[in-house]
Amino acid sequence: MSDNSKTRVVVGMSGGVDSSVTALLLKEQGYDVIGIFMKNWDDTDENGVCTATEDYKDVVAVADQIGIPYYSVNFEKEYWDRVFEYFLAEYRAGRTPNPDVMCNKEIKFKAFLDYAMTLGADYVATGHYARVARDEDGTVHMLRGVDNGKDQTYFLSQLSQEQLQKTMFPLGHLEKPEVRRLAEEAGLATAKKKDSTGICFIGEKNFKNLLSNYLPAQPGRMMTVDGRDMGEHAGLMYYTIGQRGGLGIGGQHGGDNAPWFVVGKDLSKNILYVGQGFYHDSLMSTSLEASQVHFTREMPEEFTLECTAKFRYRQPDSKVTVHVKGDKAEVIFAEPQRAITPGQAVVFYDGEECLGGGLIDNAYRDGQVCQYI
Protein backbone atom coordinates (compact mmCIF):
# COMPACT_ATOMS: atom_id res chain seq x y z
CA MET A 1 0.00 0.00 0.00
CA SER A 2 1.30 3.46 -0.84
CA ASP A 3 2.25 5.78 2.00
CA ASN A 4 0.01 8.83 1.73
CA SER A 5 1.25 10.48 4.93
CA LYS A 6 3.77 12.61 3.04
CA THR A 7 1.09 13.95 0.67
CA ARG A 8 -0.62 17.06 2.01
CA VAL A 9 -4.21 17.64 0.89
CA VAL A 10 -5.96 20.89 1.82
CA VAL A 11 -9.75 20.43 1.88
CA GLY A 12 -12.22 23.23 1.27
CA MET A 13 -14.73 22.71 4.10
CA SER A 14 -18.06 24.52 3.89
CA GLY A 15 -19.69 23.11 7.00
CA GLY A 16 -21.79 20.76 4.86
CA VAL A 17 -21.92 16.98 4.78
CA ASP A 18 -20.13 16.57 1.43
CA SER A 19 -16.95 18.42 2.36
CA SER A 20 -17.02 16.83 5.83
CA VAL A 21 -16.98 13.32 4.32
CA THR A 22 -14.30 14.43 1.83
CA ALA A 23 -12.00 15.31 4.75
CA LEU A 24 -12.94 12.10 6.59
CA LEU A 25 -12.14 9.84 3.61
CA LEU A 26 -8.77 11.49 2.97
CA LYS A 27 -7.86 11.25 6.65
CA GLU A 28 -8.82 7.54 6.64
CA GLN A 29 -6.65 7.04 3.55
CA GLY A 30 -3.68 8.33 5.51
CA TYR A 31 -3.18 11.73 3.86
CA ASP A 32 -1.83 14.75 5.72
CA VAL A 33 -5.14 16.68 5.75
CA ILE A 34 -5.80 20.34 6.58
CA GLY A 35 -9.32 21.81 6.56
CA ILE A 36 -9.97 25.34 5.31
CA PHE A 37 -13.19 27.30 5.74
CA MET A 38 -13.64 30.07 3.17
CA LYS A 39 -15.58 33.17 4.19
CA ASN A 40 -16.57 34.80 0.94
CA TRP A 41 -19.69 36.79 1.74
CA ASP A 42 -20.44 39.02 4.71
CA ASP A 43 -24.10 38.75 5.47
CA THR A 44 -26.94 37.14 7.36
CA ASP A 45 -29.70 34.95 5.95
CA GLU A 46 -33.39 35.84 5.66
CA ASN A 47 -33.92 35.00 9.35
CA GLY A 48 -31.08 37.18 10.63
CA VAL A 49 -28.75 34.23 11.24
CA CYS A 50 -25.12 34.71 10.24
CA THR A 51 -24.77 31.53 8.22
CA ALA A 52 -20.97 31.79 7.95
CA THR A 53 -20.65 31.68 11.76
CA GLU A 54 -22.92 28.63 12.00
CA ASP A 55 -21.11 26.87 9.15
CA TYR A 56 -17.70 27.56 10.68
CA LYS A 57 -18.85 26.03 13.97
CA ASP A 58 -19.73 22.87 12.03
CA VAL A 59 -16.30 22.85 10.34
CA VAL A 60 -14.61 23.14 13.75
CA ALA A 61 -16.74 20.32 15.18
CA VAL A 62 -16.01 17.97 12.24
CA ALA A 63 -12.29 18.82 12.11
CA ASP A 64 -12.01 18.11 15.84
CA GLN A 65 -13.92 14.83 15.43
CA ILE A 66 -11.66 13.49 12.69
CA GLY A 67 -8.50 15.00 14.13
CA ILE A 68 -7.27 17.48 11.52
CA PRO A 69 -6.03 21.08 11.84
CA TYR A 70 -8.31 23.76 10.40
CA TYR A 71 -8.13 27.42 9.46
CA SER A 72 -10.53 30.10 8.29
CA VAL A 73 -9.57 32.34 5.38
CA ASN A 74 -11.36 35.45 4.14
CA PHE A 75 -11.89 35.79 0.39
CA GLU A 76 -14.66 38.42 0.53
CA LYS A 77 -12.73 40.91 -1.62
CA GLU A 78 -11.77 38.29 -4.20
CA TYR A 79 -15.36 37.03 -4.33
CA TRP A 80 -16.73 40.54 -4.77
CA ASP A 81 -14.19 41.50 -7.45
CA ARG A 82 -14.11 38.26 -9.44
CA VAL A 83 -17.60 36.78 -9.02
CA PHE A 84 -20.19 39.22 -7.69
CA GLU A 85 -19.22 42.15 -9.94
CA TYR A 86 -19.45 39.79 -12.93
CA PHE A 87 -22.84 38.56 -11.64
CA LEU A 88 -24.20 42.14 -11.49
CA ALA A 89 -22.70 43.13 -14.86
CA GLU A 90 -24.40 40.17 -16.54
CA TYR A 91 -27.79 41.14 -15.10
CA ARG A 92 -27.25 44.74 -16.22
CA ALA A 93 -26.68 43.38 -19.74
CA GLY A 94 -29.99 41.48 -19.66
CA ARG A 95 -28.29 38.09 -19.32
CA THR A 96 -28.76 35.32 -16.72
CA PRO A 97 -25.34 34.49 -15.25
CA ASN A 98 -24.18 31.28 -13.61
CA PRO A 99 -22.16 32.47 -10.60
CA ASP A 100 -21.26 28.92 -9.53
CA VAL A 101 -19.21 28.36 -12.70
CA MET A 102 -17.27 31.59 -12.08
CA CYS A 103 -16.97 30.90 -8.35
CA ASN A 104 -15.30 27.55 -8.99
CA LYS A 105 -12.96 29.04 -11.58
CA GLU A 106 -11.94 32.12 -9.58
CA ILE A 107 -12.40 31.27 -5.90
CA LYS A 108 -12.48 27.56 -5.06
CA PHE A 109 -9.85 26.59 -7.63
CA LYS A 110 -7.91 29.87 -7.84
CA ALA A 111 -7.88 31.96 -4.64
CA PHE A 112 -8.27 28.86 -2.46
CA LEU A 113 -5.80 26.79 -4.50
CA ASP A 114 -3.20 29.58 -4.33
CA TYR A 115 -3.70 29.83 -0.55
CA ALA A 116 -3.42 26.05 -0.14
CA MET A 117 -0.07 26.10 -1.96
CA THR A 118 1.27 28.52 0.69
CA LEU A 119 0.44 25.82 3.25
CA GLY A 120 2.57 23.31 1.36
CA ALA A 121 -0.33 21.50 -0.29
CA ASP A 122 0.30 18.82 -2.89
CA TYR A 123 -3.41 18.80 -3.73
CA VAL A 124 -6.66 20.51 -2.86
CA ALA A 125 -9.89 18.56 -2.45
CA THR A 126 -13.55 19.58 -2.42
CA GLY A 127 -16.87 17.83 -1.93
CA HIS A 128 -17.87 18.11 -5.58
CA TYR A 129 -19.44 15.11 -7.31
CA ALA A 130 -16.92 14.68 -10.14
CA ARG A 131 -13.94 12.43 -10.87
CA VAL A 132 -10.44 12.88 -12.23
CA ALA A 133 -8.51 10.27 -14.20
CA ARG A 134 -4.78 10.64 -14.77
CA ASP A 135 -3.03 9.39 -17.93
CA GLU A 136 0.48 7.93 -17.82
CA ASP A 137 1.78 11.15 -19.40
CA GLY A 138 0.22 13.14 -16.54
CA THR A 139 -2.78 14.55 -18.44
CA VAL A 140 -5.84 14.81 -16.20
CA HIS A 141 -9.34 14.08 -17.53
CA MET A 142 -12.39 15.31 -15.62
CA LEU A 143 -15.18 12.72 -15.57
CA ARG A 144 -18.80 12.89 -14.44
CA GLY A 145 -19.57 11.82 -10.88
CA VAL A 146 -21.15 8.37 -10.73
CA ASP A 147 -24.25 9.85 -9.04
CA ASN A 148 -25.90 11.18 -12.18
CA GLY A 149 -28.36 13.35 -10.24
CA LYS A 150 -25.54 15.01 -8.29
CA ASP A 151 -22.83 15.24 -10.98
CA GLN A 152 -21.30 18.74 -10.80
CA THR A 153 -18.97 18.77 -13.81
CA TYR A 154 -21.29 21.38 -15.40
CA PHE A 155 -20.15 23.87 -12.73
CA LEU A 156 -16.49 22.78 -13.00
CA SER A 157 -16.29 23.13 -16.78
CA GLN A 158 -14.08 26.24 -16.71
CA LEU A 159 -11.29 24.57 -14.73
CA SER A 160 -7.90 24.43 -16.44
CA GLN A 161 -5.57 21.47 -16.82
CA GLU A 162 -3.25 23.15 -14.28
CA GLN A 163 -6.08 23.41 -11.74
CA LEU A 164 -7.18 19.81 -12.31
CA GLN A 165 -3.59 18.56 -11.90
CA LYS A 166 -3.75 19.77 -8.29
CA THR A 167 -7.29 18.60 -7.50
CA MET A 168 -8.86 15.54 -5.87
CA PHE A 169 -12.59 14.74 -5.80
CA PRO A 170 -12.96 11.93 -3.23
CA LEU A 171 -16.77 11.79 -3.54
CA GLY A 172 -16.83 11.28 -7.31
CA HIS A 173 -17.27 7.50 -7.08
CA LEU A 174 -20.00 7.71 -4.41
CA GLU A 175 -23.74 8.35 -4.51
CA LYS A 176 -25.26 10.89 -2.15
CA PRO A 177 -27.01 8.36 0.16
CA GLU A 178 -23.63 6.63 0.68
CA VAL A 179 -22.06 9.95 1.66
CA ARG A 180 -24.82 10.54 4.23
CA ARG A 181 -24.37 6.99 5.54
CA LEU A 182 -20.59 7.46 5.94
CA ALA A 183 -21.20 10.71 7.83
CA GLU A 184 -23.73 9.04 10.14
CA GLU A 185 -21.52 6.00 10.77
CA ALA A 186 -18.65 8.31 11.73
CA GLY A 187 -20.98 10.39 13.92
CA LEU A 188 -20.06 13.60 12.13
CA ALA A 189 -21.74 16.77 13.38
CA THR A 190 -22.95 17.54 9.84
CA ALA A 191 -24.43 14.10 9.09
CA LYS A 192 -28.04 15.32 9.10
CA LYS A 193 -27.44 18.87 7.87
CA LYS A 194 -29.54 19.69 4.82
CA ASP A 195 -27.85 20.43 1.50
CA SER A 196 -27.19 24.06 0.70
CA THR A 197 -28.92 25.62 -2.28
CA GLY A 198 -28.97 29.07 -3.78
CA ILE A 199 -26.13 31.16 -5.15
CA CYS A 200 -22.57 29.98 -4.56
CA PHE A 201 -21.53 31.22 -1.06
CA ILE A 202 -24.43 33.69 -0.80
CA GLY A 203 -26.97 30.99 -0.02
CA GLU A 204 -30.73 31.03 0.20
CA LYS A 205 -31.50 34.72 0.02
CA ASN A 206 -34.59 36.22 -1.52
CA PHE A 207 -33.17 36.64 -4.99
CA LYS A 208 -35.30 39.66 -5.93
CA ASN A 209 -34.31 41.49 -2.75
CA LEU A 210 -30.64 40.69 -3.27
CA LEU A 211 -30.60 42.03 -6.83
CA SER A 212 -32.62 45.14 -5.99
CA ASN A 213 -30.07 46.03 -3.29
CA TYR A 214 -27.45 46.50 -5.99
CA LEU A 215 -29.30 47.25 -9.24
CA PRO A 216 -32.19 49.71 -9.56
CA ALA A 217 -35.22 47.95 -11.03
CA GLN A 218 -36.65 49.48 -14.20
CA PRO A 219 -40.26 48.41 -14.71
CA GLY A 220 -41.47 48.31 -18.31
CA ARG A 221 -44.06 46.83 -20.66
CA MET A 222 -44.83 43.16 -21.02
CA MET A 223 -45.95 42.26 -24.55
CA THR A 224 -46.70 39.30 -26.79
CA VAL A 225 -44.46 38.84 -29.83
CA ASP A 226 -47.32 40.06 -32.04
CA GLY A 227 -47.58 43.33 -30.11
CA ARG A 228 -50.40 42.86 -27.55
CA ASP A 229 -49.79 44.76 -24.30
CA MET A 230 -49.95 42.37 -21.32
CA GLY A 231 -49.28 44.80 -18.49
CA GLU A 232 -46.13 45.78 -16.62
CA HIS A 233 -43.00 43.82 -15.76
CA ALA A 234 -40.97 44.51 -12.60
CA GLY A 235 -37.59 44.82 -14.34
CA LEU A 236 -35.98 42.65 -17.03
CA MET A 237 -33.28 41.39 -14.66
CA TYR A 238 -35.89 39.49 -12.63
CA TYR A 239 -36.89 37.24 -15.54
CA THR A 240 -35.12 34.48 -17.40
CA ILE A 241 -35.87 32.95 -20.80
CA GLY A 242 -38.38 30.10 -20.48
CA GLN A 243 -39.55 31.19 -17.02
CA ARG A 244 -43.18 30.42 -16.18
CA GLY A 245 -43.94 31.79 -12.70
CA GLY A 246 -44.05 35.38 -11.51
CA LEU A 247 -45.61 36.94 -14.62
CA GLY A 248 -48.94 37.81 -13.04
CA ILE A 249 -50.91 36.74 -16.12
CA GLY A 250 -53.04 33.66 -16.61
CA GLY A 251 -54.94 32.13 -19.49
CA GLN A 252 -57.50 34.95 -19.32
CA HIS A 253 -55.67 36.81 -22.10
CA GLY A 254 -56.70 35.01 -25.25
CA GLY A 255 -58.80 32.02 -26.08
CA ASP A 256 -57.09 29.23 -24.14
CA ASN A 257 -55.76 28.58 -20.68
CA ALA A 258 -52.25 27.50 -21.72
CA PRO A 259 -49.61 28.85 -19.31
CA TRP A 260 -47.54 31.92 -20.17
CA PHE A 261 -43.75 31.94 -20.44
CA VAL A 262 -41.01 34.51 -20.89
CA VAL A 263 -40.06 34.14 -24.57
CA GLY A 264 -37.82 37.17 -25.14
CA LYS A 265 -36.36 40.46 -23.93
CA ASP A 266 -35.55 43.76 -25.60
CA LEU A 267 -33.05 45.53 -23.37
CA SER A 268 -32.93 48.68 -25.53
CA LYS A 269 -36.71 49.20 -25.29
CA ASN A 270 -37.13 47.56 -21.86
CA ILE A 271 -39.80 45.16 -23.16
CA LEU A 272 -40.42 41.67 -21.78
CA TYR A 273 -41.92 39.32 -24.38
CA VAL A 274 -44.29 36.57 -23.25
CA GLY A 275 -46.05 33.75 -25.05
CA GLN A 276 -48.31 30.80 -24.35
CA GLY A 277 -47.11 27.22 -24.47
CA PHE A 278 -44.05 25.42 -23.16
CA TYR A 279 -42.73 24.92 -26.70
CA HIS A 280 -43.62 28.39 -27.98
CA ASP A 281 -41.84 29.02 -31.31
CA SER A 282 -39.86 31.92 -29.83
CA LEU A 283 -38.35 29.60 -27.20
CA MET A 284 -36.90 27.17 -29.74
CA SER A 285 -33.47 27.56 -31.33
CA THR A 286 -31.18 25.56 -33.60
CA SER A 287 -27.72 26.90 -32.68
CA LEU A 288 -25.86 29.20 -30.31
CA GLU A 289 -22.76 31.36 -30.13
CA ALA A 290 -20.50 31.07 -27.09
CA SER A 291 -17.49 33.02 -25.83
CA GLN A 292 -14.94 32.38 -23.08
CA VAL A 293 -14.74 28.88 -24.55
CA HIS A 294 -12.24 26.80 -22.67
CA PHE A 295 -11.17 23.16 -22.60
CA THR A 296 -9.91 21.19 -19.63
CA ARG A 297 -6.98 19.85 -21.64
CA GLU A 298 -4.95 21.10 -24.58
CA MET A 299 -6.84 21.47 -27.85
CA PRO A 300 -5.99 23.05 -31.23
CA GLU A 301 -6.71 26.76 -31.77
CA GLU A 302 -9.33 25.93 -34.41
CA PHE A 303 -11.22 22.65 -34.80
CA THR A 304 -14.64 21.00 -35.16
CA LEU A 305 -15.98 18.62 -32.54
CA GLU A 306 -18.90 16.17 -32.59
CA CYS A 307 -19.97 15.64 -28.98
CA THR A 308 -22.86 16.13 -26.57
CA ALA A 309 -23.66 19.25 -24.57
CA LYS A 310 -25.65 20.53 -21.63
CA PHE A 311 -27.15 24.03 -21.71
CA ARG A 312 -28.23 23.99 -18.07
CA TYR A 313 -27.53 21.93 -14.97
CA ARG A 314 -29.15 18.46 -14.73
CA GLN A 315 -30.37 18.59 -18.31
CA PRO A 316 -29.98 15.42 -20.41
CA ASP A 317 -27.12 15.64 -22.91
CA SER A 318 -27.95 16.73 -26.47
CA LYS A 319 -25.96 15.91 -29.61
CA VAL A 320 -24.14 18.92 -31.06
CA THR A 321 -21.49 19.94 -33.58
CA VAL A 322 -19.06 22.52 -32.20
CA HIS A 323 -16.96 24.79 -34.43
CA VAL A 324 -14.23 26.27 -32.23
CA LYS A 325 -12.10 29.28 -33.14
CA GLY A 326 -9.92 30.59 -30.33
CA ASP A 327 -12.13 31.29 -27.31
CA LYS A 328 -15.34 31.43 -29.36
CA ALA A 329 -17.57 28.64 -30.68
CA GLU A 330 -20.62 28.06 -32.81
CA VAL A 331 -22.67 25.17 -31.45
CA ILE A 332 -25.16 23.55 -33.86
CA PHE A 333 -27.87 21.34 -32.36
CA ALA A 334 -28.91 17.98 -33.81
CA GLU A 335 -32.44 18.74 -32.50
CA PRO A 336 -33.98 22.17 -31.72
CA GLN A 337 -33.48 23.21 -28.10
CA ARG A 338 -35.76 25.14 -25.75
CA ALA A 339 -34.88 28.30 -23.78
CA ILE A 340 -31.18 28.63 -24.59
CA THR A 341 -30.30 31.44 -22.20
CA PRO A 342 -27.55 34.06 -22.76
CA GLY A 343 -25.18 34.16 -19.78
CA GLN A 344 -25.59 30.49 -18.92
CA ALA A 345 -22.88 27.89 -19.51
CA VAL A 346 -22.80 25.47 -22.42
CA VAL A 347 -20.74 22.43 -21.42
CA PHE A 348 -19.30 19.78 -23.73
CA TYR A 349 -19.00 16.05 -23.05
CA ASP A 350 -17.41 13.05 -24.74
CA GLY A 351 -19.09 10.12 -23.01
CA GLU A 352 -18.12 10.35 -19.34
CA GLU A 353 -15.53 13.09 -19.87
CA CYS A 354 -16.30 16.78 -19.41
CA LEU A 355 -14.27 18.53 -22.12
CA GLY A 356 -14.93 22.12 -21.04
CA GLY A 357 -17.40 24.75 -22.17
CA GLY A 358 -18.18 28.41 -22.63
CA LEU A 359 -20.74 31.11 -21.87
CA ILE A 360 -23.76 31.49 -24.14
CA ASP A 361 -23.86 34.86 -25.96
CA ASN A 362 -26.77 34.37 -28.36
CA ALA A 363 -29.21 31.72 -29.53
CA TYR A 364 -30.20 31.42 -33.19
CA ARG A 365 -33.26 30.04 -34.94
CA ASP A 366 -32.37 28.96 -38.48
CA GLY A 367 -29.68 31.62 -38.71
CA GLN A 368 -31.75 34.45 -37.17
CA VAL A 369 -30.72 35.70 -33.73
CA CYS A 370 -33.32 35.11 -30.99
CA GLN A 371 -34.30 38.27 -29.12
CA TYR A 372 -33.26 37.12 -25.66
CA ILE A 373 -31.29 40.23 -24.57
UniProtKB/Swiss-Prot annotation:
Gene Ontology process terms (BP): tRNA wobble position uridine thiolation
Cysteine disulfide links: 103-200
Reactions it catalyzes: S-sulfanyl-L-cysteinyl-[protein] + uridine(34) in tRNA + AH2 + ATP = 2-thiouridine(34) in tRNA + L-cysteinyl-[protein] + A + AMP + diphosphate + H(+)
Region (Interaction with target base in tRNA): 98-100
Pfam families: tRNA_Me_trans, tRNA_Me_trans_C, tRNA_Me_trans_M
GO cellular component: cytoplasm
Main localization, broad class: cytoplasm
Domain of life: Bacteria
Protein keywords: ATP-binding, Cytoplasm, Disulfide bond, Nucleotide-binding, RNA-binding, Transferase, tRNA processing, tRNA-binding
Family to which this protein belongs: Belongs to the MnmA/TRMU family.
Site for Interaction with tRNA, residues: 128, 344
InterPro entries per record: MnmA-like, MnmA-like_C, MnmA-like_central, MnmA-like_central_sf, Rossmann-like_a/b/a_fold
EC number assigned by the record: 2.8.1.13
Residues annotated to bind ATP: 12-19, 38, 127
Single GO MF descriptor: tRNA-uridine 2-sulfurtransferase activity
Chain intervals for the UniProt region annotation (Interaction with tRNA): 150-152, 312-313
Full protein name: tRNA-specific 2-thiouridylase MnmA
Active site, renumbered: 103, 200
NCBIfam families tied to this protein: PRK00143.1, trmU
Location(s) in or outside the cell: Cytoplasm
